[in-house]
Amino acid sequence: MILHTLRLRSFRAHAESEFDLAPSINLLYGANGAGKTNVLEAVHYLCLTKSFTASRDRYAVRKDAPYFEIEGRIGQVREEPMTVRLAYVPGEGKSIFVNGAELDRLADIVGTLPVVVFSPEDYDLTAGGPSERRRFVNNILSQARSVYMETLMKYRRARRQRNEVLRSYKKRSAPPPDELLAPWTEKLVGLGSRIVHRRQQFLQAFADDLEEAYRRIDAVAERPTIEYDTIADLAPDATPDAIEDEFRAALARKQGQERDRGTTLVGPQRDELVFRLDDLEVRRYGSQGQHRTFAMALKLAQYFYLQQRNDTEPLLLLDDAFGKLDAERTGVFLDLLRSDAVGQSLVTATRRGPFEPALNAEPASHRALQVRPGGGTAAVTPDPEYARGEATAANGAASAPTGADAASTSRD
């Protein structure tokens, strides 16, 4: 599936913007601060109901607006697309609609159109704290299997309840009675063990995708691997029952510390992933180039993994992903975007120069949109030169469209 059209209303810099998108490369280019990243963020909201930044929903509402709304038409290239609309009202929350009917849960849309994001913040994936790497795994597995996301949400609720019991009795300077703590402990063990087991299975399957992705990006013969540091020294093929037994035993060993600190100290919320190139631990000893290459390989491997396990090609969002790449790796990625291995992509850049060969080679499959700030919003128009070339390719001879004929418009 692809995203055919996108409409933003009162979202970030966009008062009201509409986009007609091509089935392959869609280049959004313009000056910094023009609103390019906002477009990718809106697509991420539509696919996963949240931003790929750390920003809260209320900050995405345009100044002085009462809400924001994002709408997209999603479907196969030659089939009637469905209309997906997400609305957010501060104080009321988010709602999502498919063909006008509101879904019971926001989570029900996740996985409909899988999405993979490349951004400058990917450096945090290899250099940041463990939570960045857990978030990466959760993102992949939630899009691949809805049952994983449901289990994760139930686990978080159970952990919050267990922590409330621990905190309340910490204030009383007394251990919580078993009849209060034990039910939440058992629920935590059951749900947490399923999460750990699924992560183990995922990392075993993901290893081949990571090697393939790294090989495509870098010709250096380094072997990327991921070590999984979880509840205890579990065997990679540990059964769910074995994981439950170890989880329960680990909680028993930490019982006193948990009472003193008023929080759960064991579980998948403390998992760590260790990235290595051969024997080199990337987070501690990797060069900036190795960090950047490993992070890009992880995201490309994510694309391959979701591509194999979903009924549709993932959508690639690349936010200034080429800004710090050398010419050779930029060329490698552009070739990949143009190939049959990758479906639709939305790419932001400050200039269109590096993309000219791809844009000119297949004008029916690619599109260039220039994003310019205008009147406090982001005015989006097809690039005149590109539009002229596209029209010529389609009709043999045609003049460039005027601003009134633009396929993508933005208005206050």
UniProtKB/Swiss-Prot annotation:
UniProt keyword DNA damage present: yes
Subcellular location: Cytoplasm
GO molecular function, one term: ATP hydrolysis activity
GO cellular component labels: cytoplasm
Disordered, as annotated region: 369-412
Keywords: ATP-binding, Cytoplasm, DNA damage, DNA repair, DNA replication, DNA-binding, Nucleotide-binding, SOS response
Residues that hold ATP according to the record: G30, A31, N32, G33, A34, G35, K36, T37
SMART domains noted in UniProt: AAA (SM00382)
Compositional bias segments (type: Low complexity): 389-412
Disulfide partners: none
InterPro entries per UniProt: AAA+_ATPase, DNA-binding_RecF, P-loop_NTPase, RecF/RecN/SMC_N, RecF_2
Keyword flag DNA-binding: yes
GO biological process terms held by the UniProt record: DNA replication; DNA synthesis involved in DNA repair; double-strand break repair; SOS response
Taxonomic superkingdom: Bacteria
Family the UniProt entry places it in: Belongs to the RecF family.
Function: The RecF protein is involved in DNA metabolism; it is required for DNA replication and normal SOS inducibility. RecF binds preferentially to single-stranded, linear DNA. It also seems to bind ATP.
Name of the featured protein: DNA replication and repair protein RecF
Native species: Salinibacter ruber (strain DSM 13855 / M31)
